[in-house]
Structures are given as C-alpha cells and as structure tokens.
Amino acid sequence: MASGDFRLCDVVLDDSIGRSTPDVEHERAVAIFDLIEENTFEPAGHDGGPYRLHISLVDAKLVFAIKTEDDKDVSTHILSLTPFRRIIKDYFLICESYYEAIRSSTPSQIEAIDMGRRGIHNDGSQTLMDRLSGKIKVDFDTARRLFTLVCVLYWRG
C-alpha cells in the first residue's frame, strides 16, 4: 500500500436493488468511469489507498463501505438520506424534463434545463461533501460523481 495514495480504484453499487432505465444506467457507467479516472478520496485516520468503495442503501440509509485495494476493511459510514430527499426528488424531476427536451426541444430550451439540472446537482454534491466532512475528504468533482451514483441507487431503490 502506497502511503498517501488517496484515491478510489474501484466503485461498486449494490446490485441487489436491480437495474434502471437505459438513461440512468448510462449516467451510472459514466460517473463510475470518470470517478475512477480522477478523484480525491481520503478516509479520516487512514494512511492511504487506493480504495474500493461499495455504495448501498440499507434501511433507507446510504452506506459507504470502504476497503483497501487488497480488500482490507477501512471503514463504513452510514448516512441519513433525509438531507438528500428534496434535492434528489428535484433532480429526478428536472432530469425527466431534460431527457424529454433532448428529444423534442430547441437547443436553447435544452441548455436552460441543463443549467437548472447542474445547479441542483451542485447542491446535492455540496450536501454530500458536508455530510462526509470529518469522515471522508473529497474534492467537489469527486462529490459530484458520487452524488450521481447516490441518485442512481435512490432511483433503483
């Protein structure tokens, strides 16, 4: 284990929830690919990774189970979904509008909806960073990709 290698090398979503729509599955695949390519992930009190992250929903709570690359347990963090519910609901509503707009709207309408979608996504990402504070240090881009995955899990669940 390389000391100070604070990054994710693998991210897995709980498969027991099942699959979702092709649009949502595409978002999941892109978020995982981008997350593995570039991220900052520093569990508090640990010397360094890289890390494997398993994200799941258990009893309506968000669970981040962290292991080292060689599968040694690092920590598990359980977060309430309550601070995310409104943001996720708003995000899903605007995503539905966005996917509809892609099929039938003008570029300026699509851009306006996309700006709103990104704004709500940023709010969710900041909320996730705040909830992880003191547990896992992440940069904003990492939080954005993780928030996408939280939404995918929530959508399936």
UniProtKB/Swiss-Prot annotation:
Transmembrane segments annotated in the record for this chain: none
Pfam families tied to this protein: UPF0262 (PF06793)
- InterPro entries linked to this entry: UCP032146
Q: Which family does it belong to?
A: Belongs to the UPF0262 family.
Per its UniProt record, what HAMAP family does this chain match? Answer: UPF0262
The protein's name is: UPF0262 protein Atu0536
State the taxonomy lineage: Bacteria, Pseudomonadati, Pseudomonadota, Alphaproteobacteria, Hyphomicrobiales
